[in-house]
């Protein structure tokens, strides 16, 4: 984990539109970052939302699921199994007046997240849960305990463009914590559920 090249080879995909430094992807420092949080007395610790809530999955046995349903399942798991009170925002931000607008959705969702955090200062983890988009012939799945399971990917937006540098209006004071969170989650998934995760994807936005 101390090797930058090792991290890039085994853990990360850095999109060509952005860049990362060796100081930022310091694996030892990231895994040692203390991200522990105490469970509050009935206070929410996690917020799940969907910038692109209209995303759906390929039909299986005639049924089509949505990414919002995945969020509902995750909320149930966190609360019933782990006792982590979770807020799930089921708003569809990418449909405006009946028209699909994936870009404007980030502004709408961002405003709602800010309001939710102001109302619920106990929240420590915010998850923007998406469905990936790939060719229909590609099946990104593995087997967990003999059951076919979709692979997941952790995604970090680092507010930086390769050619223009840091994006000032998108300054993120939590960038280092987010990078630590995704790497620690990646390592835990690898420990308990090998092959569940794809490489962490890093992009400018």
Where are these regions (language model features)?
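A short, glycine/acidic-enriched catalytic loop
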Residues: 135-171
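Catalytic-core regions of hydrolytic enzymes
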Residues: 61-74, 78-141
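Non-catalytic propeptide/linker segments at domain boundaries
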Residues: 1-47, 57
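Extracytoplasmic
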Residues: 41-43, 81, 121-124, 147-151
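Soluble periplasmic/extracytoplasmic beta-strand elements of cell-envelope proteins
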Residues: 45-50, 125-130, 153-155
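Active-site-adjacent mobile loop/cap segments within catalytic or ligand-binding domains
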Residues: 195-205
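Acidic/histidine-rich, surface-exposed loop or edge segments in extracytoplasmic proteins
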Residues: 50-61, 89-96, 156-157, 162-170
């Amino acid at each position: 984990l101390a090797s930058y090249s090792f991290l890039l080879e085994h853990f990360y995909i850095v999109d060509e539109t952005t860049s990362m430094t060796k100081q930022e992807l310091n694996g030892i420092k990231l895994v040692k970052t203390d991200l522990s949080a105490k469970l509050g007395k009935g206070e929410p610790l996690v917020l799940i939302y969907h910038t692109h809530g209209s995303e759906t999955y390929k039909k299986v046995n005639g049924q089509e699921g949505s990414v919002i349903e995945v969020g509902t399942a995750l909320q149930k798991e966190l609360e019933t199994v782990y006792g982590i009170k979770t807020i799930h925002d089921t708003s569809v931000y990418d449909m405006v007046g009946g028209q699909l607008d994936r870009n404007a959705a980030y502004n709408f969702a961002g405003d709602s997240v800010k309001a939710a955090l102001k109302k619920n200062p106990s929240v420590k983890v915010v998850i923007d849960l998406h469905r990936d988009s790939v060719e229909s012939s590609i099946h990104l799945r593995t087997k967990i305990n003999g059951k076919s399971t979709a692979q997941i990917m952790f995604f970090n937006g680092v507010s930086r463009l390769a050619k223009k540098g840091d994006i000032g209006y998108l300054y993120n004071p939590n960038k280092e914590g987010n990078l630590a969170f995704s790497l620690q989650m990646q390592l835990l998934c690898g420990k308990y559920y090998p092959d569940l995760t794809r490489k962490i994807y890093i992009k400018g936005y």
